[in-house]
A protein has these predicted regions:
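Cell-wall glycan-active module
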Residues: 1-5, 15-21, 25-164, 168-189, ...
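Functionally critical loop-and-helix segments that line ligand-binding/catalytic clefts
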Residues: 200
């Protein structure tokens, strides 16, 4: 028998999986803990199915898919302790700024130089930044995640109240993605948060920003590095990347008051404003540029920067100053290493 989700889309609504699952449950062939993972009968799941149906997804297909989703406790454990929240900056940085990751970044750049140059030309995003994001996210496509995306999103949508609204939206987007792209949703793997492919796009980001490099077919961010590169560049461009502008500037602080850093990651005041408050750039920078002060825990005390618009754009990929700094530092290390190999 052809698996339900690998059948052509036009035939999917003619096959029912949920009754089979209900029969299996009724005769006790699935342990209670595992059975608790079937979500299709939950009120919140029914709302997801209704929303998907309004968007054009077959309701039977959506219900069957949610019936196949399994609750994963390891996902709930992982999301409770992300590295950005459990490690100080100097330890977090060491995860990504390794010689191996730098060397493989150079190799990835060399292998895809033509595509990177083309995407950089159309988006304004430097190749090294695109390479670094893919390097931080998945080690250049090597580690893209082992969880079924449907399990991750269903678990977090229905069993993680703290962010249920966000992950419910992502679950709905995933149903649409799988239906529109004619993908087998049970075969798609990703991170514990449901992020997918080389660049770890969430389903809503895929639908909004993923692009096919050659313009043919749905973007394949899972197996096609060209589409992944194009999609990362397009994501940053769409979030306001400014071609040729700086990203972040190191600084010293005369009076490191906690109130100085309470404004968040979005640039809100001019560099001149921050200078007047005692935050002094260590490198030349346009004092009219809008910036946000960044404060991270270094091995010896605190480290400070002024984050400019492009730094903020990187944080739209992952809302963390440490993430953006890791991407930026890795990008500069990769670019420097590649220049050295060219000598």
């Amino acid at each position: 028998m052809t698996p339900l989700f690998s059948t052509p889309r036009a035939q999917r609504g003619k096959i029912r999986l949920a009754p089979i699952l209900l029969w299996v449950l009724s005769v006790g062939l699935i342990a209670p803990d595992a059975a608790a993972g079937f979500y299709s009968d939950r009120p919140a799941a029914i709302e997801v199915i209704k929303s998907a149906e309004l968007a054009g997804v077959d309701a039977v297909w959506a219900a069957d898919l949610l019936s196949a989703a399994e609750r994963q406790q390891s996902i709930l454990d992982a999301i409770a302790r992300p590295a950005e929240k459990t490690k100080p900056w100097h330890q977090y940085r060491q995860i990504f700024l390794t010689q191996r990751r730098i060397d493989e970044g150079v190799a990835f750049w060399d292998q895809h130089a033509t595509v990177l140059d083309s995407v950089s030309l159309t988006t304004g995003v430097p190749p090294e930044v695109i390479v670094a994001i893919i390097g931080v996210e998945t080690f250049y496509g090597r580690i893209t995640g082992s969880y079924r995306v449907i399990d991750a999103l269903a678990t977090l949508a229905f069993d993680y109240p703290k962010r249920s609204t966000f992950f419910t939206g992502e679950l709905e987007a995933f149903l649409l993605l799988a239906w529109e792209a004619d993908k087998d949703p049970l075969a798609l793997k990703g991170s514990y948060a449901g992020a997918m492919g080389y660049g770890q796009f969430m389903p809503s980001s895929y639908r909004a920003y993923a692009t096919s490099y050659d313009g043919e077919g749905a973007p394949d961010i899972w197996d096609n590095p060209n589409d992944a590169i194009s999609s990362v560049g397009n994501y940053l461009r769409a979030h306001g990347w400014r071609s040729g502008e700086r990203v972040v500037v190191p600084a010293t602080v005369t009076d490191p008051s906690p109130q100085l850093f309470e404004g968040g990651l979005k640039p809100s005041q001019s560099v001149a404003h921050w200078i007047a408050l005692g935050m002094l750039p260590s490198e030349p920078v346009d004092e009219d540029a809008i910036a946000a002060p960044i404060d991270l825990e270094a091995q010896q005390g605190r480290a400070y920067w002024l984050g400019l618009q492009n730094f903020y754009v990187i944080t739209r990929y992952n809302h963390s100053a440490m993430y953006a700094m890791a991407v930026w530092d890795l990008s500069q290390s990769i670019a420097a290493a590649r220049r050295e190999t060219a000598l």
